[in-house]
């Protein structure tokens, strides 16, 4: 989100081209980053699911990755719309007759609404997934209780703020969502890496 391009006011055709290029690069990086994050989420789910003392894997962890997969599809659509479709429409608008401006703005408003809908779906679904992972960790371990507690609180707060409309998912609003969720993923990842290192050392000592 730190390199997400922002455009405001009247754009020249040259500015529209530069905005489209910057938007494509930023959103491509976002897609690649989220793919890596999703792979990490799969590893996290395997770790949490194995912590259940029963013979079957923990259902909360399994439900979390299913919900997160749903969130991933929504994010893919939102990113494609914001990063590729919207800039392409703006380029076409800049080269069209000025008299067609109102029609183009209606189209852009509709596409933006489409983007916002999927951004909300992603933000809420990803928060629910973090809540489920955190609840699984609180029940069976696998992640530090402080990290799990933060995940529960952050997920609920983000969901409520989005639901009541206090958190608008523009560039700055999405930055808040991404940062709050990224903090949880980074902390959980560090904890899992330390646990793995500790387990390896114990095996070597044995």
Please identify what each model-predicted range represents.
Residues 1-206:
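Hydrophobic, aromatic-enriched alpha-helical segments typical of multi-pass transmembrane helices
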């Amino acid at each position: 989100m730190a390199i997400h391009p922002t455009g405001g006011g009247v754009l020249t055709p040259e500015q529209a081209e530069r905005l489209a290029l910057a938007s494509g690069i930023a959103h491509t990086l976002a897609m690649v980053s989220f793919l890596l994050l999703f792979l990490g989420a799969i590893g996290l789910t395997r770790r949490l699911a194995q912590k259940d003392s029963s013979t079957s894997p923990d259902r909360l962890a399994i439900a979390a990755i299913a919900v997160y997969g749903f969130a991933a599809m929504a994010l893919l659509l939102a990113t494609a719309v914001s990063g590729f479709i919207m800039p392409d429409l703006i380029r076409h608008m800049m080269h069209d007759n000025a008299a067609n401006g109102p029609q183009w703005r209606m189209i852009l408003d509709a596409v933006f609404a489409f983007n916002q809908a999927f951004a909300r779906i992603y933000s809420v679904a990803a928060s629910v997934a973090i809540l489920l992972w955190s609840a699984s960790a609180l029940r069976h371990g696998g992640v530090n209780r402080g990290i799990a507690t933060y995940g529960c609180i952050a997920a609920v707060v983000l969901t409520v703020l989005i639901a009541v409309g206090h958190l608008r998912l523009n560039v700055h609003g999405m930055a808040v969502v991404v940062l709050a969720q990224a903090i949880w993923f980074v902390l959980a990842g560090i904890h899992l890496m330390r646990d793995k290192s500790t387990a390896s050392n114990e095996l070597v000592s044995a």
